[in-house]
């Protein structure tokens, strides 16, 4: 089993979790292929984490399975936008931590 962590990704954790759920349990090669054609911005970051986890373990993508794909919330960058009548409103720029674990599938005994 090997893992990869990408921290402080400028992406909302709720949007990234939608993609992470799709990939969990998939073959790594199939997951990378499906992420390549997803229109979401977070798909690129999760694909990078999967390929990094595969490389960290010294595996080939076709021989491993994505056992766990987690997206945790990171710190929120707070900014202000000027508004009417001299007021200001808050802008929240959320960040995420992407954690991916890959391992070889266990052989089922018949």
From Swiss-Prot:
Is-annotated flag, keyword rRNA-binding?
Answer: yes
Molecular function terms from GO:
rRNA binding; structural constituent of ribosome
| Keyword match Flavoprotein | no
Checking SUPFAM superfamilies in the record gives: Ribosomal protein L22 (SSF54843)
Q: Kindly list the cysteine pairs connected by disulfide bridges.
A: none
For this protein, the record's Gene3D superfamilies field holds: Ribosomal protein L22/L17
Q: Which InterPro entries match?
A: Ribosomal_uL22, Ribosomal_uL22_bac/chlpt-type, Ribosomal_uL22_bac/org-type, Ribosomal_uL22_sf
- Which keywords does UniProt give here? Ribonucleoprotein, Ribosomal protein, RNA-binding, rRNA-binding
GO biological process terms, alphabetically, are: translation
Origin, by domain of life?
A: Bacteria
Q: Which GO terms describe its cellular component?
A: cytosolic large ribosomal subunit
- Biased-composition ranges, Basic residues, are 84-95
- Segments for region (Disordered): 84-110
Report quaternary structure and partners. Part of the 50S ribosomal subunit.
State the similarity comment. Belongs to the universal ribosomal protein uL22 family.
Role, per record: This protein binds specifically to 23S rRNA; its binding is stimulated by other ribosomal proteins, e.g. L4, L17, and L20. It is important during the early stages of 50S assembly. It makes multiple contacts with different domains of the 23S rRNA in the assembled 50S subunit and ribosome.
The entry's protein name is Large ribosomal subunit protein uL22
Q: Which organism is it from?
A: Campylobacter concisus (strain 13826)
